[in-house]
């Protein structure tokens, strides 16, 4: 769990920025959003398949775009 120590003379904005950076690195917010509602194994697999297809299509698009420049 992220946590910071506020130093003397630290402004609130600076401490908040450091805390926010730590939470972003540890994926706390995204994990909370993912666990907000129960998700069955089949739903997880379905989402993984969809994301895998998106990655493949993105790679193909980038590859074709790169090849067209040659």
UniProtKB/Swiss-Prot annotation:
InterPro entries: Ribosomal_bS21, Ribosomal_bS21_CS, Ribosomal_bS21_sf
Keyword set, alphabetical order: Ribonucleoprotein, Ribosomal protein
PROSITE patterns hit by this protein: RIBOSOMAL_S21
UniProt GO BP: translation
Entry's Gene Ontology molecular function annotations: structural constituent of ribosome
Family to which the UniProt record says this protein belongs: Belongs to the bacterial ribosomal protein bS21 family.
Name used for this protein in its record: Small ribosomal subunit protein bS21
Lineage: Bacteria, Pseudomonadati, Campylobacterota, Epsilonproteobacteria, Campylobacterales
Gene name linked to the record: rpsU
């Amino acid at each position: 769990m992220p946590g910071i120590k506020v130093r003397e003379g630290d402004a609130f904005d600076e401490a908040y920025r450091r805390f926010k950076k730590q939470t972003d690195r540890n994926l706390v917010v995204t994990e909370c959003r993912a666990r907000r509602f129960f998700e069955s194994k089949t739903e997880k697999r379905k989402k993984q398949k969809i994301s895998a297809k998106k990655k493949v299509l993105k790679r193909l698009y980038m590859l074709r775009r790169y090849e067209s420049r040659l």
